[in-house]
């Protein structure tokens, strides 16, 4: 079977490995904006092209007689790549544009949740003008401010965090209003977690819960990033969660998929990503994404025991409910090595060498190859993942691998450590009283 992967990041490298491990021995093709050396090594052939060039994507897929496609990042979904491939007779794992809007229009997503009474929605309003927006900030007093469109996970600012006070919240709102509409919502206090699922339009197959670390520096300090690393526990839930927290989050996602079918008239087929915050009164929705998280994809794909291509086929055929899907009962810790100075002033074009990474797996993200050597760009460079019986053991494997990457790199040593996880557990105990 010929499969096309669209996208060229660390997440897509993990997806490519998942596809290549299949017993069906598929031929993998890729279309990516920049050459990812990890993906290129797994492919029969690849095309370097902007992933949002819809006609070029379809043209390449037809020329290579592609039988099924997987869209990795959000931008091509927002551009309608899935719609165009289906029209060309090529089934796609990745929702059509009318469903992917749940990620690329934050205002639409909140209004949709409200319309269908989906649990976990904050008090919020959407604004296009400054005065009513500022008045609403005064009314709520503790807010999150979001641009309506795609921001690569870096556009949201929260009071008590990136926004020190009401004045800062108003100033950021005014700045965003110059570019478009703004969503202002009540700020939730709690611990964030990610729940991802394969969706075939009706049925959902859930991956274990993951916790990502958005802040650049240790101790959850510094600016937001695309994600510095993430971990899963040996079961479905994280150490600070209760089983009922997971069940509530699953129900929210099931209700969302059902409501999307009702709203759009088509089934949501692909990956649904729920970003939740666990509060004293249960899980609330931070946002939905229409694709795997990066780094969270690395954690969960590495645990999958069921054939990845079988799952892809079930997603596009709508038969996911008949496929038993299983995961290895192990813990994972994923950590990103990023260029020194990232995210604000990253050192580009620095050579990276990889020594013995032991039992870890390695995924290339924003790097490039020149004369057989690997160099950094301005974004996250290389992810390593440790898999073991416990989070502590997985963390050691990942950390050891990072110590064997050489170059002008930086990483967070605290992700997956007992001290940081205990901090999360204590925080939730305190909130729950």
From Swiss-Prot:
Residues reported to bind Mg(2+) 2: 287, 289
Family: Belongs to the GARS family.
SUPFAM superfamilies: Glutathione synthetase ATP-binding domain-like, PreATP-grasp domain, Rudiment single hybrid motif
Amino acids binding ATP: 137-194
Parts forming coiled coils: none
SMART domains: GARS_A, GARS_C
Taxonomic source organism: Methanosarcina barkeri (strain Fusaro / DSM 804)
Cofactor note: Binds 2 magnesium or manganese ions per subunit.
Catalytic activity: 5-phospho-beta-D-ribosylamine + glycine + ATP = N(1)-(5-phospho-beta-D-ribosyl)glycinamide + ADP + phosphate + H(+)
UniProt-recorded name of the protein: Phosphoribosylamine--glycine ligase
Binding site for Mn(2+) 2: 287, 289
An annotated Gene Ontology molecular function: phosphoribosylamine-glycine ligase activity
Top-level taxon in the UniProt lineage: Archaea
């Amino acid at each position: 079977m010929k499969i096309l992967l669209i996208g060229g990041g660390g997440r897509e490298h993990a997806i490519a490995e998942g596809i290549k491990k299949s017993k069906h021995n598929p031929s993998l093709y890729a279309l990516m904006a920049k050459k990812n050396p990890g993906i290129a090594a797994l492919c029969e052939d690849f095309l370097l092209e902007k992933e949002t060039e819809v006609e070029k994507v379809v043209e390449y897929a037809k020329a290579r007689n592609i039988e099924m496609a997987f869209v990795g990042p959000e931008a091509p979904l927002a551009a309608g790549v899935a719609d165009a491939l289906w029209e060309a007779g090529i089934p796609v794992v990745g929702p059509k544009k009318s469903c992917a809007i749940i990620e690329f229009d934050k205002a639409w997503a909140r209004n949709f949740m409200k319309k269908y009474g989906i649990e976990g929605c904050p008090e919020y309003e959407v604004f296009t003008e400054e005065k009513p927006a500022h008045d609403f900030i005064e009314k709520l007093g503790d807010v999150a401010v979001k641009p309506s469109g795609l921001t690569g996970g870096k556009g949201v600012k929260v009071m008590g965090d990136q926004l020190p006070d009401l004045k800062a919240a108003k100033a950021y709102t005014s700045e965003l209003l110059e570019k478009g509409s703004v969503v202002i919502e009540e700020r939730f206090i709690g611990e964030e977690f990610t729940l991802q699922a394969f969706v075939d339009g009706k049925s959902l197959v859930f991956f274990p819960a993951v916790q990502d670390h958005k802040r650049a520096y240790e101790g959850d300090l510094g600016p937001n990033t695309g994600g510095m690393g993430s971990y899963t526990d040996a079961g479905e839930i994280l150490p600070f969660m209760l089983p009922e927290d997971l069940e509530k989050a699953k129900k929210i996602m099931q209700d969302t998929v059902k409501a999307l079918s009702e709203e759009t008239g088509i089934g949501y087929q692909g990956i649904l990503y729920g970003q939740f915050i666990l509060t004293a009164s249960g899980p609330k929705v931070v946002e939905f994404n229409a694709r795997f998280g990066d780094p969270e994809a690395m954690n969960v794909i590495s645990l999958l025991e069921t054939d990845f291509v079988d799952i892809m086929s079930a997603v596009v055929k709508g038969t996911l409910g008949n496929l038993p899907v299983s995961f290895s009962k192990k813990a994972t810790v994923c950590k990103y090595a990023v260029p020194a100075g990232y995210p604000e002033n990253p050192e580009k074009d620095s050579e990276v060498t990889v020594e013995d990474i032991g039992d870890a797996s390695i995924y290339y993200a924003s790097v490039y190859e020149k004369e057989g050597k690997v160099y950094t760009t301005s974004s996250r460079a290389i992810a390593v993942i440790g898999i073991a019986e416990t989070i502590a053991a997985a963390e050691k494997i990942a950390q050891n691998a990072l110590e064997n990457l050489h170059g002008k790199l930086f990483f967070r040593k605290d992700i997956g450590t007992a001290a940081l996880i205990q901090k999360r557990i204590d925080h939730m105990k305190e909130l729950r009283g």
